[in-house]
Regions:
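Hydrophobic alpha-helical transmembrane segments
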Residues: 136, 140, 170-224
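Membrane-interface junctions at transmembrane-helix termini in multi-pass inner-membrane proteins
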Residues: 147-172, 191, 306
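Signature of the first transmembrane helix
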Residues: 17-81, 111, 145, 180, ...
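Helix-loop junctions and terminal segments of transmembrane helices
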Residues: 70-86, 161, 225, 282, ...
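Alpha-helical transmembrane segments of multi-pass membrane transport and lipid-handling proteins
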Residues: 1-4, 97-127, 141, 185-189, ...
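Transmembrane helix-bundle signature of multi-pass secondary active exporters and lipid flippases
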Residues: 55-70, 256, 279-298, 327-331
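Interhelical loop/hinge segments that connect adjacent transmembrane helices in multipass membrane
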Residues: 2-18, 195-201, 213-260, 311-312
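Membrane-interface helix-capping segments at transmembrane helix termini in multi-pass transporters
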Residues: 49-54, 86-97, 111-143, 189-199
Length: 334
C-alpha cells in the first residue's frame, strides 16, 4: 500500500482525543485529590501512621510489577486501533483470546507466588520493618485480588485502542470515592482494620477493570463474548503470534520499575521512622504530574497505530514537543 501524508482530519481527531483525555484526567485528579485527603485523614486518624505507611508500601505492587501483563497491552492496543470492523474482526478476536490466555497464566503465577511467600513468612524480609503485625497475610491477599483482576484489564486496553482514552480515565475516578466508602464503613463498624486498608485499596482499583470490561463488552458486541468463549478451546482455536510486539513492551516494563518504583522499598529498609509516610504524602503530588503526562501520551497511541495499519506517515515531533511543554507547565504549577 503506498504511503500518504497524514490527513488533517486524522491529526485533529487525535489532538481532540488528547484534549478530552487531559481534561478528564484533570477532573479525575481533582476528585481523587479531595477524596485522597479525606482517605489520608481517615487512615491516619483512625488506623494510625503505621497503617498509612503500610498502605503506601503495598500500593506499590502494581507499579513494581507492570510487566505482569507480559506486554499484552501493547498487542491489544495495536490490533484494536488498526481494525476496520472491530465487532467482527477475526484477527482481533484471536488476539484477545490469546491475551486472556496469557493473562490467566500470569495471574496464576502471581497468586501462587503470593501464597508461597505468605506460607514461608518471607514478606517481612522482603518489605522491611514498616510492615505491621499480620502484614504478611495482607500482602498475600492484595496479590490475590490483583491477580484476580488482571485478566479483566483487557477491557481497558480495548477502550484505549478504540480511541476512547477519556472513558478509561473517567472510570478511574471511582477509586478514591469507593475507598472512602469502605473506610467509613470500617470506622462506623468500629473495626480494627489497619491491615485491611491496603486490601480495600486493591478492591477499589478493581472497580476500574470491571467498569471498563463492561463498557468494552457493550461497545464491541459480540467481539469480547466470542473471544472469551474461545479461551478454553486450546486445540480448536489457535493463538496468534504476539512476541514481536509484546517482547519490546515487556522489556520496558521490566526496566521502568527498577528505575522509578523501588524508592519505597529502600525507605522501608533503610529510612528513619516516619520517612516512608512522609514520602507517600510527597509522592501524591508528583504522581499527579506523571500520570497526566502518561495518560495523554497513551491517548496518542491508537492514532499512530491506526496510521501504521493504513500506511500513513505520522510525525511524533509535534506531540513530543506538546508533552514536554505540558510536563514543564505542570511542574511549575506544582
Amino acid at each position: 500500500m503506498p504511503r500518504t501524508p497524514a490527513e488533517p482530519s486524522s491529526r485533529s481527531g487525535a489532538w481532540a482525543s488528547v484534549q478530552r483525555t487531559a481534561l478528564s484526567k484533570v477532573l479525575v485528579m481533582g476528585v481523587a485529590g479531595v477524596f485522597g485527603l479525606i482517605n489520608t485523614r481517615i487512615i491516619i486518624g483512625h488506623f494510625g501512621t503505621d497503617a498509612y505507611a503500610q498502605n503506601g508500601l503495598l500500593a506499590t505492587f502494581p507499579s513494581l510489577m507492570p510487566f505482569t501483563d507480559l506486554g499484552i497491552g501493547a498487542v491489544i492496543l495495536n490490533t484494536v486501533a488498526g481494525s476496520e470492523d472491530l465487532p467482527r474482526d477475526a484477527v482481533v478476536r484471536r488476539t484477545l483470546t490469546t491475551a486472556v490466555r496469557v493473562l490467566l497464566i500470569s495471574s496464576l503465577v502471581i497468586a501462587t507466588t503470593g501464597v508461597v511467600l505468605g506460607l514461608l513468612g518471607a514478606w517481612p524480609t522482603l518489605l522491611g520493618e514498616d510492615l505491621m503485625d499480620g502484614g504478611g497475610t495482607t500482602a498475600t491477599v492484595c496479590l490475590l485480588v490483583y491477580a484476580a483482576a488482571l485478566p479483566l484489564s483487557v477491557g481497558q486496553r480495548v477502550i484505549v485502542g478504540m480511541g476512547r482514552s477519556a472513558t478509561q480515565v473517567i472510570s478511574t475516578g471511582v477509586v478514591s470515592p469507593a475507598l472512602t466508602c469502605m473506610l467509613l464503613a470500617a470506622v462506623v463498624a468500629r473495626l480494627d482494620a489497619g491491615n485491611a486498608v491496603p486490601v480495600m485499596s486493591y478492591l477499589a482499583n478493581t472497580l476500574v477493570s470491571l467498569i471498563c470490561i463492561v463498557v468494552a463488552w457493550r461497545a464491541t458486541r459480540p467481539l469480547l463474548a466470542d473471544a472469551m468463549r474461545d479461551v478454553p478451546r486450546l486445540r480448536a482455536v489457535r493463538g496468534v503470534r504476539i512476541i514481536d510486539t509484546a517482547g519490546p513492551q515487556l522489556v520496558q516494563s521490566l526496566v521502568i520499575p527498577i528505575a522509578f518504583q523501588t524508592d519505597r522499598l529502600l525507605l522501608s529498609h533503610l529510612g528513619e521512622d516516619g520517612s516512608l509516610a512522609q514520602y507517600n504524602l510527597a509522592a501524591q503530588l508528583f504522581n499527579l504530574l506523571t500520570q497526566t503526562v502518561a495518560v495523554t501520551g497513551v491517548a496518542m497511541w491508537p492514532h499512530f497505530a491506526k496510521a501504521r495499519a493504513r500506511g500513513r506517515i505520522e510525525s511524533p515531533f509535534a506531540a513530543s514537543t506538546a508533552f514536554a511543554g505540558l510536563g514543564g507547565a505542570l511542574g511549575l504549577l506544582l
